[in-house]
């Protein structure tokens, strides 16, 4: 049966579903009808509750583990709860103070990012993650210097004053004026742009046939920018803190999942790709279980938010990873506040 939108559930079904999710997120254990019937907020018999829970199971919102008569939310159920029922409040004054204190210790920005990640890990009881900003410098000047009939030296000057020299192959018989034309075009037209922005503008200009240089110079411009983009230093760095939080008492019955998660955190590449995908949004993103396709863990969730530099561009992502039974209502605003605090620090 297709999972219905929250508005199509009856009031009784919504009440039972909310209580099951709340109890599961608190204890990590399946919830039985007798337990729910004892709650003062739910004036239903165990039999009535069982019928409602059966309906919710048929909708794909609840599941019954083989070892228990109780039920727990599925990944689809958690998604429905997070998107349609969760009530998010501001982080507590104590949480805010601890996050801000972690950022006030001074030192290099990487140290502040690591401290904020450790604080977030401690407050959330998850592993804290931060994607350190890519060093995406801006272009200032580019020159193409002939070296031989088949090679040219590309001199790349960045806005921060760093200079890089790269050698590229050129067609035999290339007119030297094409080298001058390509360098002048980049310095005059693309100066002040990041590499990504410069490459995008060149593509647009070529596709629209607005670029005011000949074909040979166009090829040099594209290849000169591509040489710079191949620099491995531009790859983001992932900092992980608090992996031990994933090995608490509640993980004893799920050691295979935890072991696999720790392996993923050790290699970092798939997690970094997942966090990098959160750069595209403007708000906190929640990836529940297997709905993220970048790594294979079905029992883990990631909450991540982008943070920005002085120019307003997204420069990195901060977040947490833990079991799907996270306290989403508390952790989502906590991650969001950390991202905002990092943005203020970097500016």
UniProtKB/Swiss-Prot annotation:
One of its GO terms (biological process) is negative regulation of DNA-templated transcription. Keywords: Repressor, Stress response, Transcription, Transcription regulation. Pfam families: HrcA. Transmembrane segments: none annotated. NCBIfam families: hrcA. The lineage of its organism: Bacteria, Pseudomonadati, Pseudomonadota, Alphaproteobacteria, Sphingomonadales. Belongs to the HrcA family. PANTHER family: HEAT-INDUCIBLE TRANSCRIPTION REPRESSOR HRCA (PTHR34824:SF1). Negative regulator of class I heat shock genes (grpE-dnaK-dnaJ and groELS operons). Prevents heat-shock induction of these operons. This is Heat-inducible transcription repressor HrcA. GO terms for molecular function: DNA binding. It comes from Sphingopyxis alaskensis (strain DSM 13593 / LMG 18877 / RB2256).
